[in-house]
């Protein structure tokens, strides 16, 4: 699926991660296709996803890929940010994290 990167998402990726346009597009496509989704989570990580959906009303698809949270509205990347430190351990303990890492 073709991913559209909004201006806001592009600015945030440059500011927070130092990525250029090409890197943003490439990573957004990877996150959309193979990132950890709400469906793949449980426990504390699921609660974190639920909170993101409540706070970010535009987003209907949240993905975690690597150490970054991507918020999509359909096929548009709305914004992205680095995973908070207190959530990292739940991602590494999540079974889908290990399955998806082996696939890559």
Locate the predicted segments by residue.
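Ribonuclease/tRNase effector modules and their secretory precursors
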Residues: 1-104
């Amino acid at each position: 699926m073709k991913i559209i990167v909004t201006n806001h998402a592009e600015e945030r990726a440059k500011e927070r991660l130092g990525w250029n346009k090409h890197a943003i597009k490439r990573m957004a496509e990877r996150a959309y296709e193979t990132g950890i989704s709400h469906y793949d989570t449980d426990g504390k990580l699921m609660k974190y996803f639920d909170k993101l959906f409540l706070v970010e009303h535009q987003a209907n698809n949240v993905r975690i890929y690597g150490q970054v949270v991507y918020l999509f509205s359909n096929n548009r990347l709305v914004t992205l940010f680095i995973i908070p430190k207190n959530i990292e351990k739940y991602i590494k303990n999540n079974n889908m994290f290990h399955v998806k890492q082996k696939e890559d």
